[in-house]
Curated annotation (Swiss-Prot):
Entry keyword Acetylation: yes
UniProt name for this protein: Exosome complex component RRP40
Encoding gene (name): Exosc3
MF term (GO), any: exonuclease activity
Organism: Mus musculus (Mouse)
GO-annotated biological processes: CUT catabolic process; DNA deamination; isotype switching; mRNA catabolic process; positive regulation of isotype switching; RNA catabolic process; RNA processing; rRNA processing
Amino acid sequence: MAEVLSAGPESVAGCRARAVHKVLNQVVLPGEELVLPDHEDVDGLGGAGEQPLRLNAGARPRLRVVCGPGLRRCGDRLLVTKCGRLRHKEPSGGGGGVYWVDSQQKRYVPVKGDHVIGIVIAKSGDIFKVDVGGSEPASLSYLAFEGATKRNRPNVQVGDLIYGQCVVANKDMEPEMVCIDSCGRANGMGVIGQDGLLFKVTLGLIRKLLAPDCEIVQELGKLYPLEIVFGMNGRIWVKAKTIQQTLILANVLEACEHMTTEQRKQIFARLAES
């Protein structure tokens, strides 16, 4: 007599789906399935016990959850598509917040709303082609600058560095960026100065440097007066008074990714003495 096996709450990778709150800040692998809080059983995921009867099951509210990089919505679960640490940002209002996978990758995938540093590689008609480190260049209109009109065109040349924001980023269209905010103001965006040094770091280091609790930039500002621009595409532009100070700042920023807090304090103390 043939035995019928039930599939149960198993993930694509063959392992049991886990509750999303139990794996926060832990390493997740591609193929794992994560169950959102509003879909968990009282007994645990896939428990063998009987589930309690819910009289208001039909009126149960669904949490609004935003899937960031490395995650994909699969029914009532989240499917992991990248290896890394699972992160969560609490919502400002109602909802379940934002979940994403923090991975150590160098290849940038454009995301809507990201502020990036690009390099103008071509000019065709009224459109600039800007290299942002993705699979294809982004398009930038000459009208996407503060105060730009058909008569008053911005002075942008091939090879210039552009700091702007991605406004279109999906798999079916080429990326599009602008150098103005929603009010039409530059707000720090536009062509970056000719002097300074541009170098590339990992995307994880960029997120670390831009975190609210990161003190690295403040500590660097105490060493030398500097100008610095961070791009979410892994590019950093820095400028100090002298070339030597600029190179020191770039080397320290690159090394901070693999330093502990104590090692970083020792390096800053040595630089302050010299």
